[in-house]
Each structure stands twice: as C-alpha cells, then as structure tokens.
A protein has these predicted regions:
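Conserved pre-motif C helix in the palm subdomain of viral-like polymerases
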Residues: 70-101, 190-217
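Non-catalytic, polymerase-adjacent accessory regions of viral genome-replication enzymes
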Residues: 1-44, 357, 400-420
Length: 420
C-alpha cells in the first residue's frame, strides 16, 4: 500500500492537541473532546478512512442574521466532525501555501480585518484626494455558488503535489453530498457549494480565486481580497472591474450589484466592519449599533444592577481577554472625536444608573460628516444626569486612556487591565 503522507500528518498528535484546545474555546461538548483524546478512537478513525468507510455526517442548517436584516444560511457540523474538519483545514493551508495569493488576507493566523483596513487607509492617502480612487465589491452568494468542478480541482492540486490521500477522499465525498438537516430537523437535499460554516470552506474560499487575485494584483493599483469582499484602489480601477466581472462569469459567479461602490477620498465607506475616509478609520454602522447594544445590556437595560456591577461588566466587555473589543478596535480606529462619542455614551449609561433617569439617546452613523462618522442622539436626561453626578466614574478607565495605553505598548495596556 502506498504511503499516505497527508493522512499521517493529519493524525500527528500536535494537530490534535491544538484542535482539541480550539474545541474547548469553541464550546464543543466536553464528552466529545474527551473521546478524541483517546488514541483508540483516533486509530479507529484512521482505519475507517483508509478503508473508505469514514464519512462526515450531514450538517444541520442555522440562520445567521446579516447587517441588512436578512439571514445567511450556514451549515453546522456535528462536534467530532468540526474537530476533524478544523484539522483538515489547518493542514490544507500548511500543505499548499502556493495556492493562496498574497493579496488574499482572509482566515489566516496573524492577519485580522484591522490590519487590512489600516493598509487600505494608507493606500487611500497615497493615491490622492480627488475624483474616484477605486472600488469595493462583494461576491454574490460566493459560498453558495461555486460549481463542484472547481472544488474538485482544488483537491486535485493537493493530491498532485502530495499524493493520493484517504483524507482528501473523505473531503471530496462530503462536498459531493447534498444531504443536510434543516432548522426543523427534516432531512433535505440541496447543492451546498462551499458549505459555509464548515471549516474547510475557509481554505476553499481563499484558494479558488487565486488566478483572479494574481491578475488583479498585477494591475496598476492596490488590490486586496478578504473572502468575498474585494477592493481595488489605483489608476487601473476600471480595467480591474471589467476583468473581475469577466473572470467571475467564467466561473459561473457574479458580483452583488448592491455591494459595488466606487470610492472617493472625501466620503466615508464601510469595509470589513470599519469605516474609512482617506487616512481616517472609524467603526461601521453595524458595529456602532452593536457597541450601543452591548453597553446598554450591561447598564441601563440590566435590571437591579448597581454602578459597581455595571462598571465591572462594561470593563470586562471592553478590555478583558485576548479578543476584547478594545484589542480589535482601538489600534485601528484613529478618529478621536468618534472614540470620544463612544466614551461619552458609556459614561452617560453609568450616570443614568446613578440617577435612575435612562433617556440618554443612542449612537448613529452619518457618512457625510467631515471629521468623523459617529453621531449622538441627545436624550432628555443627559444634561441633568451630568449635572447631578461626579465627572469621573470610579473603577472605569476611559476609551481614550486605554487607546493611549495600547499605542504605547501591550504591556502597559495589560497592566491597566489587571488593575481593574
């Protein structure tokens, strides 16, 4: 029997240790994870894969709300399958780096949306201040519309380099299966394309447009793609758009016409959860609303809370943990007036708890503002609450203070967080 290099790497103990640690963080059932720590379980899986008897179970669908009020269908795998597919996804990225173009930034360790947005802002500043500078676009139902032949071709390339593998057979079989359970637990059949929600969908989403990424990145301008979001800034932006549409048509795909936007240096536009205007970066409208909701539910919408409890809850949300709000937002957003508006809203929520008067207005988004994009709806109790309470809130460190700490060093920031 020929050696199966990919399967050997798949069952490397280091891969499983990392995957099980991820599983704990993702709240996969502990009894399932414990089973996977047993060597006999993994040996049985390997034996079944070699014999062609191992199958990924049909997923069940879930509806995830989108910013526009619609819902996105995702395919959720069973707990053990999530671990298996997660390892397979990591392995595919490791085995085939040449299938991933440098202009594609999604789903890769160490490259978050913030880094991409910061780079885009710098490029906007370098390009100039007048007229149309480029475009941003969104693929229409990318995860649902890629024909199976392109998915097969991606797996073919892996085996052409590393040899035939039982693991790739498992993945092919799963991607050729149309079976799933709907939200009412009814057994259904429908072509699922990349199967959004499946871990391997992230690798496929990155590599399937390699040729397009390469072609657009060679034009006169700056091109970047994050999954199904694309952006081009530079002189060749019209040529780039024509090429993009032609190449997508060749693959039976298309752009979402509602999401194509031409960019100017003096108008805010939204990209990857942020808003950009030249060298200025702030939050997108959906992220502003999420911020308001998260602060309110820990303060003025939390029954029987006290100021001390609310301050602790808000500090945890804003500052504590590796993936806290501050870590994701503050190194990227550079519009001080917008950050001040967010901070004033937080402090007004704290003051409302002290006075019991909670009509304090909300936060909004205006893309035509010259110096920012966040606006505040003034509530009738704001001025009175400020007059009746102290200027400082005990135990709360302001957004501006924590941003300065983060920009100084992560160690300074961590010291302040530890003091809360």
């Amino acid at each position: 029997m020929n050696e199966d290099k990919i399967l050997q790497m798949f069952f490397d103990i280091g891969q499983w240790t990392k995957a099980i640690e991820k599983g704990v963080l993702k709240d996969i059932r502990k009894d399932q994870l414990i089973r996977l720590t047993d060597e006999h379980t993994r040996m049985a899986m390997a034996y079944a894969m070699r014999r062609g008897k191992y199958e990924i179970s049909p997923p069940h669908t879930a509806q995830i709300p989108k910013d526009n009020g619609e819902f996105r269908t995702v395919y959720v795998n069973e707990p053990m399958d999530r671990v298996v597919l997660g390892i397979a996804n990591d392995l595919l990225f490791e085995l085939m780096p040449e299938m991933l173009h440098s202009s594609c930034k999604s789903y890769q360790t160490g490259i978050g949306c913030g880094k991409v947005v910061t780079e885009v802002s710098h490029r906007m500043t370098e390009t100039g201040n007048s007229g149309c500078l480029g475009w941003k676009s969104d693929l229409s139902k990318y995860f649902d519309s890629v024909p199976i032949r392109f998915i097969d071709e991606a797996f073919d390339k892996v085996e052409a380099k590393h040899g035939q593998s039982a693991l790739i057979d498992v993945l092919r079989k799963y991607y050729h299966s149309d079976l799933y359970f709907d939200e009412d637990n009814r057994f259904q059949s429908k072509y699922q394309s990349l199967k959004q929600g499946c871990a391997v969908a992230s690798w496929l989403a990155d590599v399937l447009l390699y040729d397009l990424d390469r072609e657009l990145s060679q034009m006169n301008g700056y091109y970047v793609r994050y999954s199904d979001d694309m952006l081009f800034i530079g002189k060749d932006y019209e040529k780039a758009m024509d090429t993009l549409q032609k190449r997508l048509e060749d693959k039976s795909m298309k752009l979402n016409p509602k999401k194509v936007e031409y960019l100017a240096a003096d108008v805010w536009f939204k990209f990857l959860g942020f808003s950009i205007k030249g060298g200025m970066v702030s939050l997108s409208s959906s992220r502003i609303k999420t911020f308001q909701h998260e602060i309110e539910r820990r303060t003025i919408r939390c029954r029987d809370t006290t100021l001390a409890k609310a301050v602790d809850a808000v500090n945890r949300y804003l500052y504590k943990g590796e993936f806290s709000w501050a870590i994701q937002v503050l190194p990227v957003c550079n519009v001080k007036s917008d950050l001040n508006e967010l901070n004033k809203f937080v402090m007004d929520c704290f003051r409302a708890i002290q006075t019991g008067r909670c009509k304090i207005g909300g936060l909004g988004y205006v893309r035509t503002k010259p110096d920012g994009c966040i606006v505040r709806g003034r509530g009738r109790n704001v001025k009175a609450n400020r007059d009746k309470t102290d200027r400082d809130i005990p135990g709360y460190l302001t957004v501006g203070c924590m941003r300065n700490a983060l920009l100084t060093s992560r160690a300074v920031y961590n010291t302040l967080v530890a003091s809360l």
